[in-house]
Curated annotation (Swiss-Prot):
Protein name in UniProt: Lactamase-like protein ptaB
InterPro entries: LACTB2-like_MBL-fold, Metallo-B-lactamas, RibonucZ/Hydroxyglut_hydro, Sec-metab_biosynth-thioest, WH-like_DNA-bd_sf
EC number: 3.1.2.-
Induction notes from the record: The cluster is expressed in rice fermentation medium. Three regulators are located in the cluster (ptaR1, ptaR2 and ptaR3), suggesting that the production of pestheic acid is controlled by a complex regulatory mechanism.
CDD domains in alphabetical order: LACTB2-like_MBL-fold (cd07722)
Reported function: Lactamase-like protein; part of the gene cluster that mediates the biosynthesis of pestheic acid, a diphenyl ether which is a biosynthetic precursor of the unique chloropupukeananes. The biosynthesis initiates from condensation of acetate and malonate units catalyzed by the non-reducing PKS ptaA. As the ptaA protein is TE/CLC domain-deficient, hydrolysis and Claisen cyclization of the polyketide could be catalyzed by ptaB containing a beta-lactamase domain.
Source organism of the structure: Pestalotiopsis fici (strain W106-1 / CGMCC3.15140)
Length: 313
């Protein structure tokens, strides 16, 4: 398997777009999205044809600009139907891609690159990504890409992944949020503390709308981000409350709990795949952040981490 930045991560979608809140998000039905839709005068959305429990309606790929030459953000998962859809969409509108901007390395965003290069060899030197792989060009924070009708500014926004980029289209004061902020539910993250700091950075751009990598358009991006931050802070409090109760009630005031136990107590009986691929990694990340804040710690018991509250509240 190719490492970070590679294109053979196609089947690694299980922990890259998962809902954090299973009960509040996963059980809701998702609104249908059109395969191809002009969502603004400057932005055309093309679905990646990879719908699923974790990818929602599929990966959103975006054709940006109003002239013959345009930009493309993300390439989907490598589904042949997406390549056909992109090809017909570009041909029908006499569009020529001048550059491809990848939001991050995950396979449901980079998987379509080989198809693009097969269809459009002129793009071989025009695939851009932060921390680029061989043959790719770098994207730096603040870098600007321009085509007719679109001035797109890159924003380094780690959290969901180390190399994650968002993009601001200045003509609309809108932001392509990648997987940091989704149209429905909440994305999984690599490092919670970094992601939360990044959300505040994203808010500082004061963009109106958000164009996420999964889900429908976000009409009020800053309000959505505020909700995300509040949700994570609430989860931190809940985890700490559970650990405080366990410490008080068990083992003579020295009680502790594994991640698996905390997930069961907080979320109840959930789907095993969702539990193992989304909820347990998320709670583990919450615990790591609480440890950074010196509110919890862990000990090893039979080779397994058990977490406890440092100071009872």
């Amino acid at each position: 398997m190719v490492g970070k930045g590679g294109y053979r991560q196609i089947n690694k979608a299980l922990n890259i777009c998962a809902f954090e809140d299973y009960l509040d998000g996963q059980q809701k039905s998702l609104p249908p999205l059109n395969d191809v839709e002009q969502i603004s005068p400057n932005v055309l959305r093309v679905l990646g044809q990879n719908p699923g429990k974790f990818t929602l309606q599929g990966t959103n790929t975006y054709i940006i600009g109003t002239g013959e030459k345009r930009l493309l953000i993300d390439t989907g998962q490598g589904i042949p139907e997406w390549a056909d859809l992109i090809s017909s969409t570009l041909a029908n509108s006499s569009i020529r891609l001048s550059a491809v901007l990848l939001s991050h390395w995950h396979g449901d965003h980079t998987g379509g690159v080989p198809d693009l290069l097969r269809l459009y060899p002129h793009l071989s030197d025009s695939i851009y990504k932060h921390s680029p792989s061989k043959g790719q060009q770098p994207i730096e924070d603040g870098q600007v890409f321009e085509v007719e009708g679109a001035t797109v500014r890159a924003v380094h926004a780690p959290g969901h992944s180390h190399d994650h980029m968002c993009f601001v289209i200045e003509e609309e004061n809108a932001m392509f949020t990648g997987d940091n902020v989704l149209g429905h539910g909440t994305a999984a993250v690599e490092l919670l503390s970094t992601w939360m700091a990044t959300l505040r950075l994203m808010q500082s751009h004061n963009c109106g709308r958000g164009y996420p990598a999964h889900g429908e358009v976000i009409p009020n991006l800053n309000a959505k981000i505020s909700g995300e931050l509040a949700s994570k802070e609430r989860r931190e409090r809940q985890v700490l409350q559970h650990l405080n109760r366990i410490r008080k009630e068990e083992q003579g005031g020295k009680g502790s709990a594994t991640v698996q136990r905390l997930v069961v107590e907080m979320y109840g009986d959930t789907d095993q795949q969702m539990r193992e691929q989304a909820l347990e990694p998320f709670i583990d990340e919450v615990l790591r952040k609480l440890a950074e804040d010196e509110k919890v710690a862990f000990q090893l018991r039979a080779g397994e981490k058990t977490w406890f509250a440092i100071a009872l509240e």
